[in-house]
Amino acid sequence: MAGPQRATSGLPTRRTTTRQPTRRAGSAIPERQTSTASPAVSTKTAAISRTRTLKSPGEPASVLAKRKERDIEREINEDTSIHVVVRCRGRNEREVKENSGVVLQTEGVKGKTVELSMGPNAVSNKTYTFDKVFSAAADQITVYEDVVLPIVTEMLAGYNCTIFAYGQTGTGKTYTMSGDMTDTLGILSDNAGIIPRVLYSLFAKLADTESTVKCSFIELYNEELRDLLSAEENPKLKIYDNEQKKGHMSTLVQGMEETYIDSATAGIKLLQQGSHKRQVAATKCNDLSSRSHTVFTITVNIKRTTESGEEYVCPGKLNLVDLAGSENIGRSGAENKRATEAGLINKSLLTLGRVINALVDKSQHIPYRESKLTRLLQDSLGGRTKTCIIATISPARSNLEETISTLDYAFRAKNIRNKPQINSTMPKMTLLREFTAEIEKLKAELIATRHRNGVYMSVESYEEMKMENESRRIISEEQRAKIESMESSLRHKVQELLTLTSKFNDLKKDNDDTLAALCSTNDVLQQTDIVLQNTRAQLEEEEMLRCAHEETEHQLQDVGKGLISTLGQTVEDINSLQSKLDRKAELDATNAELWRASSTEVSDVTKRIDQRVEAFQTRHAKLLETTSVKVNEFIATEISNIERTRSDLSEYNRSLDAACNNAKAETSSAHEDMNNVLEEIKDLREEVKSKVGEGLNGLSAAAARISEEVIGEFTQLHSQLHTSFNNLGKDLKSIFETMATHLSEQKNEINRLRAELQSSNRQNIETTHKASAHLAQAIEEEHVAAEAEREILMSQIKALVEESRQKQFARLRAKIDGVRTEISASGDMLEQATTQHDRQIDEWVFKSEQFAKDVNASKDEIRTKLQNDWEAFDQRNSTIRKATESVHKETVRIVDVQVDDMGRQMEALDDFVAKARSQNGRYRDAHIATLDTIATGVRDSYSSIEGRVENLTGRMNQFQQEATHHHATLEESIAPLSNDVRKPLTDLSSSFQNRSLEEYVATGVTPKKRKYDYISVLPSTESHEVLKSRLRTTKEMEVLPFNSDDQLSGPSSSPGGSPSKGFVYNDVEDEVGTHAPTVTNVNPSNTGLREVDANVAARPLVYSTGEKSTDQDGSPVVSPDSATEAEGMNGPPSKRRRSNSVVADTKLPNKMLARRMAGMMEGRENVPPPGISNGRRLRGRPSP
């Protein structure tokens, strides 16, 4: 036998390695009973339970525990949000080599917001707000102290807590949760993650308390749970729902081992052991990519003592979840097994996202059961657990999409509301009883295994196995009963098969009889086939005519497109000419602005010259006044000396006279020089006037020439557009008149066809009723004749004949009733088809009239639009011509004004020159008079100043120097006058010579004179008779190789009859060789009603709404069978023989003909042949 099996227990397996509390030196256990074991013990709930314990110290422990739980549930009933933390790692070597930019910004090392750059095309960046945000500069200890340490404190207070890392693969989830798991002499590495730090911190907080710590480590790989701490190779774990009180559901993992630890080092060894078993693999995104989700659970039971001395156990649990990262298979390069792993990981994470969305939206159904991951996290998301999510993200731009997804999930998870509650406390004795029961159970299994008393399992396992065997036995008996029932059913089915076989033989006999009856109706089908062939020939003619009309319509459409294209070219040319006119108008406006600027400049120059001359006059007057003052002072000073020295100057009279003559000569010379300068100014003025006049006259001539050219071009364009619009209007008028005529003809033809169709339908109905009446009469006559013959033979075979008569009469009566019913139904369907056809014809006529109205409206609208466009263009042309003429007149006016203004300026300049000349003469005369006066005074004073002549000579020398200085000053003031007056005039002349008007430059866009080609003759369709004649000739050529026996020629006496048509049968199912269908007008002179055999009513017929007509004389065409049956009893035998001969000549198999006729008769039974009738006609017509 196999070794003893271990009993499966409903409770998790534990290793009883309870750690004993360490005691400090000099302390005892009773002293620790009143000390606080943890900072969280001083919570409000603990205070309440202590208060209740003090009030009732004599109550038992169970009552105190229940009261404590009720108090806790009353106090802690508030919802709390999930704590969400974001941690951003730095760029790795791969991202640095790829030069992937950074798209994240945080508020320093620790903050609460993260800003995401959405790229240059985004309107703005995206900002997320979380409880805490850590940048890449934050180390492991910072994250632990700010995030995990408060959660550890809450766990020690009795809460269930969960921390799980969520994010893209390769963003540091495993590094955050586990990190560097090595320790040196009890000192953790700086890169140690949350789990090692939690273990060390936990045991440091529990150093002075009596407690137990147990750990479990499970893995979710490919949706299968595995225990990473189990000694077995592949332990299978199962998840069950653990329903607690008040309907709250939690999950329980069956078969998971929970190992008790007594130090942080032991816990780290378990973590290392499980991490080595965890599934990892290398991808393009991460060299050590986690391929599974892991949950490291730490459960703490702390013994506490109330103030009354009662001991109880307070449990707390911390779930540390390391999720596998979401992965893009295309970027990570996962294949085969790795691709399957990535798909399952993404599936579980998507389910987690749906759970988060459902919790945020407060949906009625939360999809926890869609994934084992969400079932494990069920209590952490929306349950009674305090939860913290650490979202890890990458700052690289290459991971922007995954980063946005991670931040969106984390941001939505903030809105999840949990209801954390402190775990129920358990008295110490209750916990010991549970441990004792489990120990006893394990001992029983161990004893059963050691003794090997025949069953290597416990009694419970053996009973369970017996129950499974009994269940299998019951299932086997049920299957055996089902087999017996199925065998009995099979026997019944065999009997039913035999019965069906006999019925099949009977039906086969009936089928043979039916086939015999079917052969008797083949002649009717053959006759119908002949009628159908004639109808097809006529349909081919109609289809050919329709195709001809369609081709003509396409040609007319092409002509219309050409006309529209020509119209588009004309409009484009008009737009180009209008653009040219706009450019010329802009050029004229620019030249006018230039002339206004020139006029302003000339006015400014003349004003400046006038101002400068006036300033010169002012300065010159001041100098003269100064000189006069100085001379007067000098004379007044020296009069006394001259009077005393006059006697001494007599000898100088001659020299004084000579000096006077010289002064007069020099003054005259200065006068002549001034006159010469003024003459040069006058010559310069005449030259400027002549040049400016020539420039303005040239400008006026150019403006006149431009105006004449523009007016000429607009006149030519006006005539061309007038001709083009007239031609276009004529063409459109011709097209619309043709369309209106065509629509009117179609309307008349439709009315005529409607009248003919109604007459034909009435005649067809009357003929059908007559045939039905004749058929009933013939049946009665045959019945009477058969009765007479049976009475003669009654004496011999009375009984046999009576039975035969009754059967024959019953069969005949049934067939006749069926035929009569089908004929009536056929008449009703014909009336319905006629009504429907009339309604469709009315709709067609209405649409045609509507179309004609639309065409007329479009014609009037186009005519109005063309007239409006022409009037607008004519008005625009007149406006442009007037504007051009006004521009020319304005240019001439401006030029005349400029010439007049220049003349006035030159006249002012002449006045100035004359004024300068007169002033110079007066100055010369005054100077000579002054010299004469001085000379006379000197001569009179010679006698008195001779004694002082030496002093006078010195003073005269000084006066001469001053006079020379003043003379030089006068010359210096005169020289700038010439420059100030001449230079502005020279600049003005140069400006006029260098400034030219802008000339029009051809752009090459102005359209050239072109010839518009368009079609003036519209295509038309040939006459119907010519087209039909051509089709008949073609068909005659096609039937030449066949014998005359294969053709059915119509009677030569039929009016308008076509040549003989051949019928060629092809043994292909449902295939008839016909030409493409055409539609045309119907020639009423060659139409007739096809024959309809009274016995052809085997199936309902669908009547088409095609065109129908009557004969030339309006009488219906009746089939030979109907005619002979109407004439009497001698007709049917000869007619029957005629039908059989026709069938024999066609040589068409009966079955194939029946199938073909069934397809060809569908919808075409009573379509009258348009145009020409090739069918067989009656040998005699009934009188109308």
UniProtKB/Swiss-Prot annotation:
Modified residue annotations for Phosphothreonine: 1006
Kinesin motor domain boundaries: 81-416
Alphabetized UniProt keyword annotations: ATP-binding, Cell cycle, Cell division, Coiled coil, Cytoplasm, Cytoskeleton, Microtubule, Mitosis, Motor protein, Nucleotide-binding, Phosphoprotein
Residues that bind ATP: 167-174
Composition bias, Polar residues: 1-11, 32-51
Compositionally biased intervals (Low complexity): 12-24, 1049-1060
Segments of this protein annotated with the region Disordered: 1-64, 1041-1065, 1104-1184
Compartmental location: Cytoplasm, Cytoskeleton
UniProt record, GO biological process: cell division; initial mitotic spindle pole body separation; microtubule-based movement; mitotic spindle assembly; mitotic spindle disassembly; spindle elongation
GO annotation, cellular component aspect: cytoplasm; mitotic spindle; nucleus; spindle microtubule
GO molecular function, one term: microtubule motor activity
Residue runs in coiled coils: 489-900
Residue ranges, annotated region (Globular): 901-1184
Superkingdom assignment: Eukaryota
Pfam families xref list: Kinesin (PF00225), Microtub_bind (PF13931)
Keyword Phosphoprotein assigned: yes
Protein purpose: Important role in mitotic dividing cells. Microtubule motor required for spindle body separation.
Family statement: Belongs to the TRAFAC class myosin-kinesin ATPase superfamily. Kinesin family. BimC subfamily.
The name this protein goes by in its record: Kinesin-like protein bimC
Native organism taxonomy: Eukaryota, Fungi, Dikarya, Ascomycota, Pezizomycotina
Gene this protein is translated from: bimC
